[in-house]
Design a protein with these regions (language model features):
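Long, small/polar-residue-biased beta-strand-and-loop interaction regions
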Residues: 2-216
Length: 216
């Protein structure tokens, strides 16, 4: 190996560490500049409470005097929110009506939830049922077509329905004014046994289920 070759090799070896050090320093500076850790101004906002929640729509029915109360949650919880109330008889429950007599029953429906009911309906069952009342029964078979009912919205002073029980059954759902959260609406049911019926209508009963519904 010549003297000049050895000197050149030695020179390269002396500059190699310096080149490596310079490269490492450059990489570090580049990394720092890209990460922004040398930035002097920083601003931030953290929204720690971001929530949304659903309301509840529930119904309460009461008789006159509020001695009997039925709620839509009586059938379980708000997850079910549907109940059957057999303790409020909107046709009065009289078993001794005579021709020409009217029995009136007032009730109230309240929106006990936290949201408004966008629709409010009263839906009769599809069939009015005639049955025997006691052991002495007439032979008539059309009591549902004779007995009448007038349903009045006493809060709005409007007639909801007026006609026979059979007609109510065949008429389908009846739309009622919407109910705000906490609002109470009064209704009355005036059931009449016509004065024109004779002995064949003695000892008979008519029944028809009615369903109140809120929806939002």
């Amino acid at each position: 190996m010549s003297v000049s070759t050895s000197a050149s090799k030695a020179k390269r070896l002396r500059f190699a560490p310096l080149a490596i050090a310079t490269g490492v320093l450059g990489a570090v500076l580049l990394s720092v500049s890209m990460s922004g850790t040398l930035s002097g101004f920083v601003a931030s906002i953290t929204n720690s409470t971001n929530t949304a929640a659903s309301g509840a729509l529930t119904m309460q029915e009461q008789n006159s005097g509020a001695t009997v109360t039925c709620s839509s949650t009586d059938g379980g919880t708000v997850s079910t929110n549907s109940a059957t109330c057999a303790t409020i008889n909107k046709f009065g429950g009289s078993t001794t009506m005579i021709p020409g007599q009217t029995v009136t029953t007032p009730i109230t429906i309240k929106n006990t939830g936290s949201v408004a009911a966008n629709t409010f309906t009263l839906t009769p069952g599809t069939t009015c049922t005639q049955s025997a009342n006691g052991s002495l029964n007439g032979t008539a078979t059309d009591l549902c077509s004779k007995m009448t009912v007038v349903i009045t919205n006493t809060t709005a002073s409007t007639t909801v329905y007026s006609g026979t029980l059979a007609g109510l059954a065949s008429g389908g759902a009846i739309a009622l004014p919407v109910s705000a959260a906490g609002a109470t609406t009064g209704f009355s049911f005036a059931v009449t046994l016509p004065s024109t019926v004779g002995n064949t209508y003695q000892g008979l009963a008519a029944s028809l289920p009615l369903t109140w519904t809120f929806s939002s």
